[in-house]
A protein has these predicted regions:
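N-terminal secretory signal peptides
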Residues: 1-38
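Solvent-exposed N-terminal domain segments of exported/luminal and surface proteins
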Residues: 40-243
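Extended beta-strand-rich segments in extracellular/periplasmic secretory proteins, especially
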Residues: 107-110, 115, 119-120, 189-210, ...
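Flexible, processing/modification-adjacent segments and terminal tails
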Residues: 137-186, 238-243, 249-337, 442-459
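A generic structural motif
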Residues: 220-224, 247-251, 345-347, 374, ...
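Short glycine/serine/proline-enriched coil/turn segments at secondary-structure junctions
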Residues: 226-227, 239-240, 334, 349-353, ...
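Cysteine/selenocysteine-centered motifs that mediate thiol-based redox chemistry or coordinate metal-sulfur cofactors
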Residues: 293, 299, 398-451, 459
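C-terminal soluble interaction/assembly domains
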Residues: 350-426
Length: 459
């Protein structure tokens, strides 16, 4: 017989007391980032009940089981409300996997190394932007790995979405109607590059002459023919009170146009339920939202490590559920020992269709694992949940340079009020020879300038 030092409800009581007292530090048995700094493993910060789904459910669920409508109520407290409804009423399933202990499998290596090296150096300046001593921009990694406030948590993800200095994601998008059929199917490319806080691309940590910018980001569509060549470029100022400059190329006009940049709750293409505002749950400048509050803490189920389908030559994923068996990606989830739930409200938009958003973050990495937005009446409206992975499986491996690539693998963006679903997956390549790449300086010239938009539109 094994005697447990902490009973099953110890963690629940701890999280409730911490929230009531406004104590925001992560970890139950010890400060989380002290445990990570010691060994690269967060396990010492949590009791056994938070380190396995079998322990949490007292043996009623175990690794390898499927969560279905028949047993989802056992883990209802671990799921955001829209995902629960998808399982309960729409045939969604989740496969359970062991909890990942090694923190290096949950973020890019260089990003994590910079987080540890620069821990404690970040501060907000008088305008609320993240700086180091001397007032210069952030120098790399997560500025607030042991965040104490909601705005620190959101500042971290807004500052660096994909956690690489540069990335190009080859994407397949599928937009489904309420009847469960794919109504639109797009091949798309999404590029990101950071001019500041660089951790592996020279020059580091800043790209000279661009220290006033936070990121370059673009999206273009390579198929079908009706959308081919349509492309958009966002250039983000470092100042988080300012909207990005948004440029677009529409083949019918054969020229670059500047678009209104505050219309971030509208789809870029027909059929999609995905908005610019949704990107990484933080697609808008930090101070165009406000009233950031930590409103919940506790364990969660999330797809943080098993999303890559190495067995498919193009990394494509299988689907299930919904009226036609096409609505949901096959998804593997695991028990996250501690998630932090943050609420925020749009303040910089005159006609935002949402009144607030709730975002769940893995406390170990401050990675957003799910989001639910609410309409102006306060009813659930839209959900965004992603799956992540280290791109290493058996003998299969995709590298970001010296280390296996870490990134998102697939996403659901679901409108619960209409029943429409957008599914995205990161694949190896798309139409036109565009292939997923990471930390490649050529990404800028190929995808992140107005000249690049023209070339993509005419290519």
């Amino acid at each position: 017989m094994r005697l447990l030092r902490y009973d099953h409800d110890y963690s629940r009581r701890h999280f409730m007391k911490s929230l009531a007292r406004g104590v925001a530090g992560a970890g139950v048995l010890m400060p989380l980032w002290d445990a990570i700094a010691q060994s690269g493993d967060a396990s010492k910060a949590y009791p056994d009940e938070l380190l396995s789904i079998e322990g949490y459910t007292r043996g009623r669920l175990k690794n390898g089981d499927l969560i279905t409508a028949a047993n989802v109520d056992l883990v209802r407290d671990l799921l955001e409300p829209i995902k629960y409804q998808q399982i309960k009423t729409m045939g969604r399933r989740l496969k359970l996997a062991p909890t990942t202990g090694d923190i290096t499998r949950l973020s890019p290596w260089e990003y994590l190394e910079a987080t540890l090296r620069n821990r404690g150096k970040a501060q907000f300046d008088g305008n609320g932007n993240i700086v180091v001593d001397g007032g210069k921009p952030w120098i790399g990694g997560n500025p607030f790995p042991d965040a104490k406030t909601g705005i620190e948590i959101f500042a971290s993800i807004t500052l660096s979405w994909g956690r690489h200095d540069a990335a190009f994601y080859a994407i397949k998008e599928y937009d489904l109607g309420v009847e469960g059929d794919v109504r639109y199917n797009y091949d798309a490319g999404w590029a990101e590059m950071s001019p500041v806080a660089r951790v592996c691309m020279e020059p580091m940590p800043y790209w000279p002459a661009h220290e006033d910018k936070l990121r370059f980001q673009s999206i273009f569509f390579a198929s079908p023919d009706s959308a081919k060549g349509t492309s958009f470029l966002n250039v983000w100022p470092y100042d988080q009170h300012s909207f990005p400059d948004l440029y677009g190329y529409v083949p019918a006009f054969k020229r670059i146009r500047q678009f209104p940049t505050d219309q971030r709750f509208e789809p870029l293409i027909p059929g999609s339920t995905l908005y610019l505002s949704d990107a990484w749950t933080a697609g808008d400048p930090l101070y165009t939202w406000g009233n950031y509050q930590i409103i919940g803490r506790g364990p969660a189920l999330a797809a943080i490590s098993g999303g890559w389908n190495a067995d498919h030559p193009n990394w494509e994923h299988k689907t299930h559920g919904g009226p036609k068996g096409k609505t949901f990606w096959d998804t593997t989830v695991e028990l996250v020992p501690e998630a932090i739930l943050v609420s925020a409200e749009p303040t910089g938009f005159k006609r935002a269709p949402v009144s607030k958003k709730h975002v769940w973050f893995d406390a170990r990495t401050m990675l957003p694992i799910a989001m639910v937005t609410f309409d102006r009446r306060g009813d659930p409206y839209h959900s965004f949940d992603g799956a992540y992975a280290l791109y290493e499986s058996g003998e299969h491996r995709f590298m970001d340079g010296r280390h296996p690539y870490w990134s998102w693998a697939h996403v659901h963006a679901f409108d619960i009020q209409t029943g429409r679903m957008t599914r995205l997956e990161q694949v190896k390549s798309i139409t036109g020879g565009h292939a997923t790449a990471v930390n490649d300086p050529a990404i800028y010239d190929r995808y992140l300038t107005n000249a690049a938009l023209m070339h993509l539109g005419n290519g």
